[in-house]
From Swiss-Prot:
PROSITE patterns in the record: RUBISCO_LARGE (PS00157)
Residues annotated as site: Transition state stabilizer: 326
Function (record text): RuBisCO catalyzes two reactions: the carboxylation of D-ribulose 1,5-bisphosphate, the primary event in carbon dioxide fixation, as well as the oxidative fragmentation of the pentose substrate. Both reactions occur simultaneously and in competition at the same active site.
Catalytically driven reaction(s): 2 (2R)-3-phosphoglycerate + 2 H(+) = D-ribulose 1,5-bisphosphate + CO2 + H2O; D-ribulose 1,5-bisphosphate + O2 = 2-phosphoglycolate + (2R)-3-phosphoglycerate + 2 H(+)
Protein name, per record: Ribulose bisphosphate carboxylase large chain
Subunit composition and interactions: Heterohexadecamer of 8 large chains and 8 small chains.
EC numbers: 4.1.1.39
Binding site for substrate: 115, 165, 169, 287, 319, 371
Any GO MF annotation of the entry: ribulose-bisphosphate carboxylase activity
């Protein structure tokens, strides 16, 4: 019997609330934390989120009869309480894969975090997690090189990589900037880095910076016999200008470039990642602006979602927080998104904030980057938390050394190697860290001076965005 059109407004839950639905392996699944307006039933507001983020609108429309609405609509299929917070609840929604353009995280996010976030029936809405089916993962390019290829390119194995963000982040001339890079690389760092807001300002145009930095890299490589790199930030006002800067970095022999993937845009990032893969370049990703989206525990996008988006869009490094430094980061939640960056399969684990199984197939992993207010005293905890497949990035913790940049780099190199050796010998880094560092400092005056300089520096503030579940 043909369907008939009934004009008017009906409740969302009549069409989009389907607790009997069993998600398909090909569905994209989303978990939202929903804070409804007072008096709005949970089922109605969950269905409204499903409708407004897929095929629905505020009224019935006759053009629904021209398509197979049952095939394309999003389905709210489950509701759960949020532990310890009765003002909100979790809504689980399944989206047919055919709703989304292949390989386009932009298209996925435009639907899932689009107009629905301004819906009046909601007081707040947060996208907590997404499950991308393997059928969709395979349409995405992913990291340009991946962890193993990067280690092979650099010929560095068995320890975390060491980096340093050049400070002051703004105001240095290109020549002095290159000098700071050289001193850090010569002292023992693997990488130095542009800060996220270093682009092409009047005090240091991008081409001048690239040239002086490459001179620093080549000189440090010749003196140390090690492969070195600097994250040259190619973020630009337009994607054409971004690609121009990337091409020049390749031309002068740079092994790695950098992009601010949120402020620069996901379309630009995907384009750049594909170019890096084609041209044998590594891609470092900064997450500038993430806290605007992810820090409010009731509204926005959780960082684990932004992590998944980056892995699909493409990047070889991603800033991940430190747990122990100056920036926000719950330990278990951080471990959860580190797993999302690196592992080929993530099992649902609510104790780490992971709501769905996630199969990445053969897609390479991303190196987590610990950066923000860290110094040598944090090294045992960082090595224990992040393991070998990571980048430990000390800006002030290198350049603030009382003897200068090279000494700061040497102190960090001695500290990381001492911690790795101690771990490999079965010692407990976070319990025995002070003894491990003190023993190493007996043979390293640079490390001893660093330990004395930062012995009282701590960042003991409570985390704003905590996991909603108890750690098991």
């Amino acid at each position: 019997m043909a369907k008939t059109y009934d004009a008017g407004v009906k409740e969302y839950r009549e069409t989009y609330w389907m607790p009997e639905y069993t998600p398909l392996d090909t569905d994209i699944l989303a978990c939202f934390k929903v804070t409804p307006q007072p008096g709005v039933p949970r089922e109605e507001v969950a269905a409204a989120v499903a409708a407004e983020s897929s095929t629905g609108t505020w009224t019935t429309v006759w053009t629904d009869l021209l398509t197979d609405l049952d095939h394309y609509k999003g389905r709210a299929y489950a509701i759960e309480d949020v532990p310890g917070d009765d003002t909100c609840f979790y809504a689980f929604i399944a989206y047919p894969i055919d709703l989304f353009e292949e390989g386009s995280v932009v298209n996925v996010m435009t639907s899932l975090v689009g107009n629905v976030f301004g819906f009046k029936a909601l007081r707040a809405l947060r996208l907590e997690d997404i499950r991308f089916p393997i059928a969709y993962v395979m349409t995405c390019n992913g990291p340009p090189q991946g962890i193993q290829v990067e280690r092979d390119l650099l010929n560095k194995y068995g320890r975390p990589l060491l980096g340093c963000t050049i400070k002051p982040k703004l105001g240095l001339s290109a020549k002095n900037y290159g000098r700071a890079c050289y001193e850090g690389l010569r002292g023992g760092l693997d990488f130095t880095k542009d800060d996220e807001n270093v682009n092409s300002q009047p005090f240091m145009r991008w081409r001048h910076r690239f040239d002086f930095v490459m001179e620093a890299i080549q000189k440090a490589e010749a003196e140390t016999g090690e492969r070195k790199g600097h994250y040259l930030n190619v973020t630009a006002p337009t994607s054409d200008e971004m690609m121009k800067r990337a091409e020049y970095a390749k031309e002068i022999g740079a092994p790695i470039i950098m992009h601010d993937y949120i402020t620069g845009g996901w379309s630009a990032n995907t384009q750049l990642a594909q170019w890096c893969q084609d041209n044998g370049m590594l891609l470092h990703i900064h997450r500038a602006m993430h806290a605007v989206l992810d820090r409010n525990p009731h509204h926005g996008i959780h960082f684990r979602v932004l992590t998944k988006i980056l892995r699909l869009s493409g990047g070889d490094h991603l800033h991940s927080g430190t747990v122990v430094g100056k920036l926000e980061g719950d330990r278990e939640a951080t471990l959860g998104w580190i797993d999302i960056m690196r592992d080929s399969f993530n099992k649902e684990d609510r104790s780490r904030g992971i709501f769905f199984d996630q199969d990445w197939g053969s897609m390479p992993g991303v190196l987590p980057v610990a950066s923000g207010g860290i110094h040598v005293w944090h090294m045992p905890a960082l090595v224990n938390i992040f393991g070998d497949d990571s980048v430990l990035q000390f800006g002030g913790g290198t350049l603030g050394h009382p003897w200068g940049n090279a000494a700061g780099a040497a102190a960090n190199r001695v500290a990381v190697e001492a911690c790795v050796e101690a771990r490999n010998n079965g010692r407990e880094l976070e319990k025995e860290g002070k003894e491990i560092l003190t023993t190493a400092a007996a043979h390293s005056p640079e490390l001893k001076a660093a330990m004395e300089t930062w012995k009282e520096i701590k960042f003991e503030f409570d985390t704003v965005d905590k996991l909603d579940v108890s750690h098991k």
